[in-house]
């Protein structure tokens, strides 16, 4: 069995909205392993993105716990949490969040520079990752000079350049047309296999979700395997 990266145990999340106590997630159990792909689908407002934020340590559960590489995220100080997250997790969102004043290469270098790599090391690793996503020839172009699909490829390269254990993606193809969405997903799945990275993707697109090894449905704050899905 492949390495266990993330584990949710009885995870729940509540928010206060005025005088109301709103239950968003309850009783969630989930394991994410290296090299496995998981799609999470559900209606808008069902809690998909909230779960992804909790998996990534960007938010904490109201009950239960999340283990990242065996460490309970609730027990960590902010410095240790940030270090663990930066070392083991990559994030991709619907909007690419590339810095417009920098080239594709410089954007992909950024996580490595933040991690104290030298510019030479960062540039070499970033260029290698841009080559993997088919953007080596566009490395000197700024975000505004790239197409929508190219910008999302650059964002994925940036998320993977630190070689994280798991990539968490929130609607990564949501701003793309159908052809580009398929191409980007193909690339993510290929890199998942090549790098042995766990992949968790939140999407509203049932067709794209069907490409993953496991599909989970978020409904009424609970997570269930999709009937008839692979897994």
UniProtKB/Swiss-Prot annotation:
CDD domains: ABC_MJ0796_LolCDE_FtsE (cd03255). InterPro entries: AAA+_ATPase (IPR003593), ABC_transporter-like_ATP-bd (IPR003439), ABC_transporter-like_CS (IPR017871), ABC_transpr_LolD-like (IPR015854), LolD_lipo_ATP-bd (IPR011924), MacB-like_ATP-bd (IPR017911), P-loop_NTPase (IPR027417). GO terms for molecular function: ATP binding; ATP hydrolysis activity; transmembrane transporter activity. Gene3D superfamilies: P-loop containing nucleotide triphosphate hydrolases (3.40.50.300). Pfam families: ABC_tran. PANTHER family: IMPORT ATP-BINDING PROTEIN, LIPOPROTEIN-RELEASING SYSTEM ATP-BINDING PROTEIN LOLD. Belongs to the ABC transporter superfamily. Lipoprotein translocase (TC 3.A.1.125) family. This is Lipoprotein-releasing system ATP-binding protein LolD.
